[in-house]
Every structure is written in structure tokens, then in C-alpha cells.
Amino acid sequence: MTALNTPEAKAQSRARQFDRLTDESGKYAVSPLPFTYDALEPVIDEKTVDLHYNFHHKAYAAAANRAEEGLAKARDTNDFALVKFYEKELAFQLSGHILHTIYWSNLAGKGAEPQGDLAKSINADFGSYQKLKGQLVAATTAVEASGWGVLGYHPTLRKLMVLQIENHQKLTAWGIVPLLVLDVWEHAYYLKYQNRRPEYVGNLFKIINWNGVAERLDAARA
């Protein structure tokens, strides 16, 4: 078996494909959606997907580029008066870009329960899929203000974990690899659900792409 055909190489290749964050020049850029704007109906309406992708996600990538440019200028001029601002901007905007990239790949599934090694890992770490779902729904719904619910894998601990993220970058745990992210910023659901966040979060499980989540777990373990 050649190095390019090992399970590890294949997992890393998959990770690169569904997590492309930059264009050929190295600038942060948004990849094309893996589905049409109406593909998530009736769970998420076409207008929300359009606005979310074209105006919110793309704005995070553009702002991350501006933050990088600001830091580069600071280094070139040895003027770090605005370093705190640009570091905070980069953490927020780049995290938003990364999480949205994962979010789109997590959707457009059939909503069936996880299978195979992913299901075994869920059972080992949470007791059952239903217990994981209960915790993830509750944690995501309870995020204070804007943020995310995350199912992640910690390679050092070798376990799955559920986390809340406020904004895009707060309350995470170092080393966690996001596998499934649920967006509860209001722009993700307000046109259709208004203040009914619990309904939106529950409905997301009808369209989760668990095969993609399983691929992410394979890549994280490689």
C-alpha cells in the first residue's frame, strides 16, 4: 500500500476537501455550497440559506482577511497600537468562517441516526444516540445570546464531547476538533422560526449529514 492510499492519507484528503478555507492565493474564501439554496426546505428556508451564506458567511471570510492585513501592516511598520483589536478580530472572524464551513457540510443529510464506528463511539461516550441528542439539543438551545452547539472529538482524550460556543470563539476547549456544529445565531433561523429556537434546533436533526460527521471523526483520529 502506497503512502497516498493509506487510511490516514485518505482521511486527511477528505478533511482538506470539505474544509477548504482559502483560495489559491491563500486568502480566506468561501467555497461553493454543497447544495442548492432550497435543498434544506422545509427545515431551513431558501431565503435564509441565501442570506446566511452570501451575506453572513462571506462577510466573516472578508473580515478575517482584513484582520490579517492589519497585523501584517503592524509587523512591517513595527506599530502595534492596534494589535489587540486585530487579534480579537481575527479570532472572531476566522472562527466564524471555520464554523460556517463545517456547518454547511453538516447539512443536507437524511436525518437518519449515526451508523458504524461513529455510532459505537457515541454509545461509548454518551450511553446512546438519544442521550447524545438530548444533551446536544439542550446545550445548543441554551447558548447565551449568539453562538453554537458543537459535537467534537478530543484526540488526546480520545473521546467525543459536547460544547457550547458563545459568539464564534468563546467557551471552547483546546484541542477539540469540531465534527458537528449547530448555528444558533439569529441570522441562521429567525426568518422562519422567529424566537422559536428550540423548534429550529430540534428540526436540524432531520437534515444532519451523519456520514459527513463520521468522515470528520475518521480524519480527527488519523
Regions found by a protein language model. Name each.
Residues 1-12:
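N-terminal export signals
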Residues 8-9, 105-114, 192-197:
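Short helix-capping/linker segments at secondary-structure and domain boundaries
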Residues 23, 27, 55, 66-75, ...:
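All-alpha RGS (Regulator of G-protein Signaling) helical domain and cognate RGS-like helical scaffolds
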Residues 42-58, 78-98, 167-169, 174-182:
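Alpha-helical scaffold segments that form or flank carboxylate-/histidine-based iron centers
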Residues 138-194, 200-211:
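An amphipathic alpha-helical core segment
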Residues 211-212, 216, 220-222:
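Low-complexity, Gly/Ser/Thr/Pro-rich intrinsically disordered linker/tail segments
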